[in-house]
Curated annotation (Swiss-Prot):
Gene Ontology molecular-function annotations: actinin binding; cyclin binding; metal ion binding; protein domain specific binding; protein serine/threonine phosphatase inhibitor activity; RNA-binding transcription regulator activity; trans-activation response element binding
Subunit annotation: Interacts with host CCNT1. Associates with the P-TEFb complex composed at least of Tat, P-TEFb (CDK9 and CCNT1), TAR RNA, RNA Pol II. Recruits the HATs CREBBP, TAF1/TFIID, EP300, PCAF and GCN5L2. Interacts with host KAT5/Tip60; this interaction targets the latter to degradation. Interacts with the host deacetylase SIRT1. Interacts with host capping enzyme RNGTT; this interaction stimulates RNGTT. Binds to host KDR, and to the host integrins ITGAV/ITGB3 and ITGA5/ITGB1. Interacts with host KPNB1/importin beta-1 without previous binding to KPNA1/importin alpha-1. Interacts with EIF2AK2.
Origin species: Human immunodeficiency virus type 1 group M subtype F2 (isolate MP255)
Binding residues annotated for Zn(2+) 2, in chain numbering: 25, 27, 30
UniProt binding sites for Zn(2+) 1: 22, 33-34, 37
Site (Essential for Tat translocation through the endosomal membrane): 11
Motif window: Nuclear localization signal, RNA-binding (TAR), and protein transduction: 49-57
Protein name as catalogued: Protein Tat
Chief localization: host cell
Source taxonomy: Viruses, Riboviria, Pararnavirae, Artverviricota, Revtraviricetes
Family, similarity comment: Belongs to the lentiviruses Tat family.
Motif (Cell attachment site): 78-80
Amino acid sequence: MEVVDPKIDPWNHPGSQPETPCNNCYCKKCCFHCPLCFMKKGLGISYGRKKRRQRRRTPQGSKIHQDPVPKQPLSQTRGDPTGPEESKKKVESQTETDP
């Protein structure tokens, strides 16, 4: 084991820095380049400032969502409009006529 000069800062020790600089490549080799690359690229963790997304704005001349809602017809009742009692009478009369 090599003797490390105590006067040198730990981050400047020989072998503490990778030989090549970090880059923007996301291949497996570059993801394991150094601990920082592993955190950023391999794990996807970055502690930088988050950029605020701006909303898309519609052009000033457009009239989207400016028209009033059109009147819709009233909902139709489903099934037999005569009511349940009359439909029961029809079923009873049909069962009596069928032998």
